[in-house]
């Protein structure tokens, strides 16, 4: 199926790989972003580039922008790394919920037939394990749940809306530092000779797989929440692979009880409060009850989505290795902009 798709946030990690997947299938792509780093020099030449800030656009401007396209991919953040001025709930309400709902509604009004929203796998766990109370505890997760509910509510018989529930992602974008260079590498650099980390693990995927999933969802006009993952991996295995690429040899990973790690979260939260900042995650609870647990998506669910979309989930290890090999390489050249949400 040849499609004409507008990707909001098309120069980010997931937007870039989605553009590649759509172009490989013969589709037309227009990318919208605030990118100022001359994306024409590295973005796929077949795609059209449009500079604009979706967060400040009116519904009318969005409708004008979407006109003539049959599909829209909403690949904008922010994600849970952002620590805005307190209260975090107000920030995520505006930047995650209201902006995405405004964009999806504008897409429907402009005649677009298919929308894919990139969400978070926290909504999957909030839905399947309600006893954990994730949305009730964490403003970021609450915003993701509301984003999903309100975007899906706009779907109709002739307008499909899918929300991809995306876990940890690995991959590269030209002219960008991997987000992991800022998020994880500095922490690992401080832990020598061993790495101390809580138990548990996470579902994960490659950016390329997310792009292919988005393409297939558009082609099949699917509506609903879709948990996207390729495999589950415990932190110990993940950190062994990452440290091997970062330091040339795997470091020993020592497991620290989750409740002990939670004490570190109290200090993090206090440091933010002193600065007048807030996190969308309540660090103490997050470290003890999320990061220290196995946030795994069942293999049956992973395989079911792959079969439904005609895709084959693969090993994420090659993407992890490429990502952290790049993290190691960036120390040898001038610093570039890190991958945005």
Residue ranges and their predicted role:
Residues 240-295:
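Terminal hydrophobic/aromatic helix or amphipathic segment near a protein terminus
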Residues 295-341:
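Amphipathic terminal alpha-helices
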Residues 5-25:
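N-terminal Rossmann NAD(P)H-binding glycine-rich loop of SDR-like oxidoreductase domains
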Residues 47-98:
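NAD(P)H-binding glycine-rich loop region in Rossmannoid oxidoreductase-like domains
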Residues 8, 32, 75, 115-121, ...:
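SDR active-site strand-loop-helix element
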Residues 98-143, 162:
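Conserved Rossmann-fold NAD(P)-dependent oxidoreductase catalytic core, especially the SDR/UDP-sugar
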